[in-house]
Amino acid sequence: MKKYFILCLLFFGTLSLYAEKVSLKVYNSFQIIEVNDVLFLGYGNRVSEIKFENDVPNVSKIILEGTAFLKDYSFISSCKNLEVLVMNNITVDNFDFLLSCKQLKVLALDSIKCNQLPNINEFKKLEYFALTNSDLELCDSFINHGQKLKFINLSYNKISKLPKLNSDDNSLYFVNGNLVKPVEQKNYIFCDDISKNLPKEFMEYIR
């Protein structure tokens, strides 16, 4: 029993040792929290500013939902090891803060209001991209992307026309719930049941 207790102390001590300190501004004061490799802010939070203590925080996953009070997302640019970014019900001007996140594998955006769409061709390691429920009308810019990107989810937007894909494009484009009528092209998926074509590892990012 004593040995087990010591092992537990060592385990939690290690977690604390490698935890990242994050300052969250709520109203007019900052509060400091510790996270390991995941930063999550859910609906109902009143955070208006986020700062990492380290210049290059070891955070691999960030989930932001309904951050109505948060306007500046530049803190994400310091996360050089970021692999997963999920943003739901958020307003942003642009996605320039992502340009330094070269390790990004998953970018899942839902109910986003923005003035400038992300250039997914910048992320050569990206495997799954989603921009859903965001009143998107044109999707031409998303057919130019890295070779590792195999799954592009553009469901439930206002797309009325689909671009012609390159002959060597093997990616799947999920376009169910749009204005466009189904076309006979294997890359475009109109089925509402995305799970039939999307690997399980990405299903957790479906809204």
Model-derived segments and spans:
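Concave beta-strand-loop units of leucine-rich repeat
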Residues: 38-47, 58-71, 75, 81-93, ...
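Sec-dependent N-terminal signal peptides
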Residues: 4-13
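Short, acidic/polar
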Residues: 50
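Boundary at the C-terminal end of the N-terminal hydrophobic targeting segment
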Residues: 17-19
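Secreted glycan hydrolases and related glycan-binding modules that recognize and/or cleave
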Residues: 22-28, 197, 201-206
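N-terminal leader/linker segments that initiate helical-solenoid repeat arrays
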Residues: 21-43
